[in-house]
C-alpha cells in the first residue's frame, strides 16, 4: 500500500538496510549480554562464552509464562483508573483518552507476587529461565509486530505515523505504520510503553535478589542499591504515567518492531543487567562508598524529576505560580519555549538526570568490568540520538524561534560539554 502523498518523512535509522540490521543486531546483543553476565570472565567485548542450542532457548513453559504476564498486565490496565488523561491532538483534530493506572498496576502486581511467594511460588527460579523467557519475549514481539503491520494496512491515512509509511515493508515493519493501534479503547502502544517491560524489569531484579539471598544467606548491599534505585525509577515512571503522552514514542513514532521488541524484551532483560551481574559476580561495597553512590543517584533523580515536573506543569498551566515567572520565547505555533529554570540550563535537563542515575546504577558493580556499564553507554548513545531526532523536529516545527532558543541555551544535554 503506497503512503499518502505528502505524508512521507525522511528515513531514519539508516533506512531499510539499517532497520533490517537493527532487527538482527538488537536480539543478538540482548542474548549476548544474558550469556556474558553469567560467564566467569563477564567480558562485554568479544565472543559469547558459548552458543545456546534450541533446547536451551525454546521452552513452551517460558512462552506460556510470557503470555500469562502480558495477560495479567492487560487485565490490570483495564481496571478503573484514578484518572483518564487526554493525548495530544491528532491529524483529525481528535484526542484519544488513556487510563493512568500504571502505578496501581505496579502495586497490585507486587501484592500478587507477594501472595504467590508466601504460597510457595519459586520466584528464585526465574533467573535460570532468563534465556528461554527472553526468546519467548522476542518471538512474541515479532509476531505482535506482524499483526500490527497487517492491521495498519487497513487503517485510514489519518491514523498512520509520520515516519512509518514509507512504502518499504522492512522499514515500515520496524518503525511501525500506525501511530495509535487500538481495539476499542485498548491502546497497544501506550500499554506496552511502560507496563509489561518496566514492571517485568522490577520482577526480574527481585528474583535475582531472592536467589542471591538463597545462595549467600542475604542480599549484598550492592544488590540492594541496584534494586532500590531501579524500583524508584520504575515507580516514578508509572506514578507520572501521563507524562509519556507527550514523548516522541507516543506522538511521533508508529508502533512496530522497534518499540514492541524494546518494550517487551529489551527493557526487562537488558535493563536488569546490573542485578544479573551481581548475582554471578558479587562485589564488595562498604557503607561510605554506598552513601556516595546514593548521593549521585539522588542528584540525578532531583534533576530528572525537577525538569520533567517543571515542563509538565508549564504545559498544563503556564500561569501556575511555580512556573509563571519563567522566561519564555513565543513561537509561530502559539506555544512558548522555556528558556529559564531547568530548561534554561540545557535543552534536555531530564536526559542529564537520566544519565547520572544510569551511572549510579552501574557503580555498585565496581569498576573492573565494563559489562555493568553497558546500560550507561547504550543509554548515552540512545539519548544523544533521540536528542538529534528531537532537534530536527523542533527546528522544522518552530523555525526562527527554535534558532533563538538554541542561541539562548547552547548546550544540549551536559552543560559546557555537549
From Swiss-Prot:
GO terms for molecular function: Delta14-sterol reductase activity; NADP binding. It catalyses: 4,4-dimethyl-5alpha-cholesta-8,24-dien-3beta-ol + NADP(+) = 4,4-dimethyl-5alpha-cholesta-8,14,24-trien-3beta-ol + NADPH + H(+); 5alpha-cholest-8,14-dien-3beta-ol + NADPH + H(+) = 5alpha-cholest-8-en-3beta-ol + NADP(+); 4,4-dimethyl-8,14-cholestadien-3beta-ol + NADPH + H(+) = 4,4-dimethyl-5alpha-cholest-8-en-3beta-ol + NADP(+). Catalyzes the reduction of the C14-unsaturated bond of lanosterol, as part of the metabolic pathway leading to cholesterol biosynthesis. One of its GO terms (cellular component) is nuclear inner membrane. Belongs to the ERG4/ERG24 family. It comes from the Eukaryota. The keyword Repressor does not apply. Its main location: membrane. One of its GO terms (biological process) is cholesterol biosynthetic process. It is a multi-pass membrane protein. It is found in: Microsome membrane; Endoplasmic reticulum membrane. Highly expressed in liver and brain. Its EC number is 1.3.1.70. The lineage of its organism: Eukaryota, Metazoa, Chordata, Craniata, Vertebrata. The chain crosses the membrane at residues 13-35, 62-81, 102-124, 129-148, 255-277, 287-304, 355-377. NADP(+) binds at residues 311, 315, 338, 343, 350-351, 390, 394-398, 405. PANTHER family: DELTA(14)-STEROL REDUCTASE, DELTA(14)-STEROL REDUCTASE TM7SF2. Pfam families: ERG4_ERG24 (PF01222). This is Delta(14)-sterol reductase TM7SF2. Pathway: Steroid biosynthesis; cholesterol biosynthesis. PROSITE patterns: STEROL_REDUCT_1, STEROL_REDUCT_2. Keywords: Cholesterol biosynthesis, Cholesterol metabolism, Endoplasmic reticulum, Lipid biosynthesis, Lipid metabolism, Membrane, Microsome, NADP, Oxidoreductase, Steroid biosynthesis, Steroid metabolism, Sterol biosynthesis, Sterol metabolism, Transmembrane, Transmembrane helix.
